[in-house]
């Protein structure tokens, strides 16, 4: 996130978070909370986002606040969710979700209802949510910014699935990348550099197109994937989102810009490149209107159950 575009609201939020930080850092993901939706596995990955050499000495934000590496960049946790009805196949499809600033894994899963929405989509895929910068104003994606970062993490996810007897064998299939706010940086760099970029079929950004529009445009031009971004005026991403429009026109990439109140499931299925303006708060854009669920429902992922006639 460009520091010059950071709204004061987010800075105030960061100060409040720092006041309760000691309590939040002790929070643990409660896996049995989601038993009704499937199986949630929380594991420490060797190939997690962090620790990473660019944050070994921590992170200083705007030359004022310092975020210590032991507190904010040492958590190797990765949540792997297997929905009820999942059927193992030769190639395992993944949906990877990256969180934004000032967050931690349990809060991400609970507040944004990721597991509930993912399970309701009835797609035959695995949800992977890695811990990013923990309770820090930082868009760095750690190892996922490296060419083999995504491949290593998903390969390790396959090992976790095998150890838990979810699958007997399998390789990495199609991939959907999604994320909120500061996740834009990690997703953009994976589209540009990842060894798995040919397998990335779709991208969902929730109020996060703050910069690197050129990388998203280049990916759309080269790989013709599906790209949907939901943006608001609340998170300071409106102008930077609309700055991508002329880039798409220059590459002769057709796109649709619409209002959330007007968009239908048919629109989501039909439009390959879609910008959706949503007049809702920045921090509610993922879950308030079940947009994550609707995007998954209309995705190219196979269903885990036969759709009702």
Question: What does each of the following model-derived ranges do?
Answer:
Residues 3-15:
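Bacterial N-terminal signal peptides that target proteins for export
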Residues 14-22:
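Bacterial N-terminal signal peptides
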Residues 27-93, 256-261, 304-308:
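A domain-start/cap signature at the N-terminus of enzymes
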Residues 91-94, 98-158:
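Active-site machinery of serine-nucleophile hydrolases
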Residues 94-98, 126-130, 174-178, 202-206, ...:
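Structural recognition of the beta-strand scaffold that forms the well-ordered cores
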Residues 142-182:
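Gly/Ser-rich "nucleophile elbow"/oxyanion-hole loop immediately N-terminal to the catalytic nucleophile
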Residues 173-216, 221-222:
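Primarily recognizes the serine-hydrolase "nucleophile elbow" in alpha/beta-hydrolase
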Residues 230-309:
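C-terminal catalytic histidine-bearing segment of alpha/beta-hydrolase fold enzymes
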């Amino acid at each position: 996130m460009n520091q010059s575009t950071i709204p004061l609201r987010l800075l105030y939020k960061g100060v409040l978070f720092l006041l309760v930080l000691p309590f939040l850092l002790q929070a643990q993901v409660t896996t049995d909370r989601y038993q009704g939706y499937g199986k949630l596995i929380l594991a420490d990955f060797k190939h997690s986002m962090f620790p990473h050499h660019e944050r070994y000495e921590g992170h200083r934000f705007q030359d004022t606040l310092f975020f210590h590496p032991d507190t904010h960049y040492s958590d190797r946790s990765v949540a792997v969710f297997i929905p009820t009805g999942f059927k193992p196949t030769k190639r395992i499809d993944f949906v990877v979700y990256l969180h934004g600033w000032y967050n931690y894994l349990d809060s991400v899963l609970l507040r944004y209802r990721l597991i509930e929405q993912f399970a309701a989509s009835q797609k035959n895929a695995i949800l992977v949510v890695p811990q990013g910068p923990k309770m820090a104003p930082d868009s760095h994606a750690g190892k996922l910014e490296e060419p083999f970062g995504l491949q290593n993490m998903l390969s390790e996810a396959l090992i976790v699935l095998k150890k838990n007897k979810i699958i007997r064998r399998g390789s990495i299939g199609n991939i959907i990348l999604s994320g909120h706010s500061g996740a834009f940086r990690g997703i953009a760099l994976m589209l540009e550099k990842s060894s798995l970029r040919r397998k990335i079929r779709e991208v969902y950004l929730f109020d996060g197109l703050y910069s690197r529009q050129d990388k998203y445009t280049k990916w759309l031009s080269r790989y013709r994937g599906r790209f949907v971004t939901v943006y608001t005026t609340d998170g300071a991403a409106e102008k930077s989102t609309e700055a991508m429009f002329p880039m798409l026109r220059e590459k002769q990439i057709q796109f649709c810009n619409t209002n959330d109140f007007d968009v239908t499931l048919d629109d989501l299925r039909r439009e390959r490149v879609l910008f959706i303006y949503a007049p809702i708060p920045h921090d509610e854009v993922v879950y308030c209107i079940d947009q994550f669920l609707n995007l998954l429902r209309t995705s190219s992922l196979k269903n885990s159950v036969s759709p009702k006639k």
